[in-house]
Design a protein with these regions (language model features):
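Basic, helix-initiating cap at the start of DNA-binding domains
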Residues: 1-38, 42-54, 80
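Short hydrophobic/aromatic patch on the recognition helix
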Residues: 54-63
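C-terminal peripheral helix-coil segments that are non-catalytic and often amphipathic
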Residues: 1-10, 145, 149, 179-211
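Residue-level preference for short helical/loop micro-motifs built around acidic side chains
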Residues: 41-42, 67-68, 76
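Short amphipathic alpha-helical segment with a characteristic S/N-K-E followed by hydrophobic residues
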Residues: 27, 65-70, 80-81
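Hydrophobic alpha-helical bundle segments that form small-molecule/ligand-binding pockets
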Residues: 111, 137-162, 180
Length: 211
């Protein structure tokens, strides 16, 4: 039946993309939870899809492997950070914008819960730790590019430098928070580090503002 001819509106591209994003998020959350409960090696793909209430072939539309499902979650805060940078107001200092975007990307309590679970799974495997380092390098580049896009072309190298310094300090602090087993919010650890970064790069922040 032609739904359009019968007067039934077809789903908009935005609706389809949101549905795909929800499915991907459901799979990553189910994967991380099961990895934490049962162990990474012990968890099977069909167990992940059952927990996410999708069929196994759906999993492979989004991920090539269990590793991709585990690290796929890290794309969510990266994407949120990039989106937040695009939305920051013109005239704002580049460091202020970067820090605000990082904080906004993990503000939800669910995000922090998944970060904690994911961190614990990865900490048990040197191989997964190596993969995390590679993922973080890629994400740092993506965030730096998003920041540079809001600055004059001559500031591209500065954007790379500041992003590398701030995100590395931020990620290291997140790792400390996960390892500590602290029950308090992640911001108890990250806020002082980001405040220090803001002071260190105060002159850069004043010199380079968003366009």
């Amino acid at each position: 039946m032609d739904r359009h001819k019968k007067g039934v509106p077809l789903p908009s591209p935005g609706h389809r993309e949101r549905k795909k994003a929800r499915t991907r998020e459901q799979l990553t959350e189910a994967a991380v939870r099961l990895f934490a409960e049962r162990g990474f090696e012990q968890t099977k793909v069909d167990e992940i899809t059952a927990a996410a209430d999708v069929v196994p072939r759906t999993f492979f539309r989004y991920f090539a492997s269990k590793d991709d499902a585990l690290f796929g979650w890290y794309d969510l805060p990266r994407d949120a950070t990039v989106a937040a940078l695009r939305a920051r107001p013109r005239g704002e200092g580049m460091v202020t914008a970067l820090i605000a975007a990082l904080e906004e990307s993990v503000r939800a309590s669910d995000a922090q819960r998944v970060i904690r679970l994911t961190g614990r799974v990865i900490a048990k495997s040197p191989e997964l730790q190596g993969r995390l380092d590679a993922v973080r390098t890629i994400h740092c580049r993506d965030i730096a590019n998003a920041l540079a896009h809001r600055l004059p072309r001559s500031a591209a190298v500065v954007a790379q430098m500041v992003t590398a310094a701030v995100t590395t300090a931020y990620a290291s602090t997140v790792d400390v928070w996960v390892a500590s087993g602290a029950s308090g919010p992640m911001s108890d650890y990250t806020a002082p580090v980001l405040k220090l970064a803001s002071k260190i790069f105060a002159s850069v922040n004043a010199q380079y503002v968003l366009r």
